[in-house]
Amino acid sequence: MNILTAKTTEQVRAKNVRFTGNVLHVLLSDRREISLQFNEVPWLKWLAKATPKQRANWSLEPGGFAIYWPDLDDGMEVCHLLDTQPIA
């Protein structure tokens, strides 16, 4: 008889977002921080084209699993920031 046991894993969430120049910094719930030069990442061109005011107006989606910029009507999921493959 096979018995399956549930494996509980905690999904990493975004806790805070900040910008320094052309770098996006995302603080994660496990205390790591991801930093990306958004002007050099092809799938973040929409963020590179935004004004500093538009970039500053962000919100965390419920649970912190995504970041959304209402002025840009765009966002990203934390799992994509952690993935080595870029979003198409």
Residue ranges and their predicted role:
Residues 1-88:
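Motif-centric detector for short Cys/His coordination patterns
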